[in-house]
Regions:
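Sequence-specific dsDNA recognition surfaces
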Residues: 41-60, 75-103
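Specificity-determining recognition surfaces
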Residues: 154-160
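A short beta-sheet element
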Residues: 73, 93-152
């Protein structure tokens, strides 16, 4: 059983919510922890060159690499071996070139099992991935990509 003490100051900004599941949520507790950190806080959107999500599309699969480009579903991004044997048609992939993964991106699953964070290395290059990934292109001039990945992978980043 979870218990906590709340006061009216925590109820008023939250639309007068009295249900305990809201106030005992780990995201709310971690958010309060972050509010009390003495360091400068910046928005995730201000640390990146680009953050984007792909459009929904129907997939046309082919049997071999000669006629296709390697395809990754969201659940494939956390696998040790990402060579799934699935290939998206090269004709279709021309229209979806913006979904081709690049090295040093951070991808976050946003459908199914949400919140899985993956840092793309050279093995991810030239793989086209599902629209169910938030793609973050880090800007090292604002924050080092390793720090951003570490934060997003932590319990604090997960609750954002």
């Amino acid at each position: 059983m979870k218990t906590s003490v709340i006061n009216t100051k925590s109820i008023l900004p939250n639309s007068f919510r009295f249900d305990p599941s809201f106030h005992l949520s780990e995201a709310i507790i971690l958010g309060k922890d972050l509010d009390n950190v003495p360091y400068e806080k910046i928005s995730i959107k201000d640390t990146n060159s680009k953050v984007f999500l792909g459009n929904i599309f129907s997939r046309i699969f082919v049997k071999d690499k000669e006629h296709g480009i390697p395809y990754l579903a969201a659940s494939d991004t956390v696998l040790a071996d990402i060579n799934t044997g699935r290939f998206l048609s090269k004709k279709q992939s021309k229209e979806l070139a913006y979904l081709i993964l690049k090295k040093d991106w951070i991808v976050i699953t946003c459908s199914g099992t949400i919140g899985n964070v993956t840092y793309t290395n050279s093995t991810f290059e030239n793989h086209i991935a599902t629209h169910d990934l938030i793609r973050i292109v880090p800007n090292d001039e604002k924050i080092l990509k390793g720090y951003l990945y570490a934060f997003l992978s932590s319990k604090y980043g997960y609750c954002q």
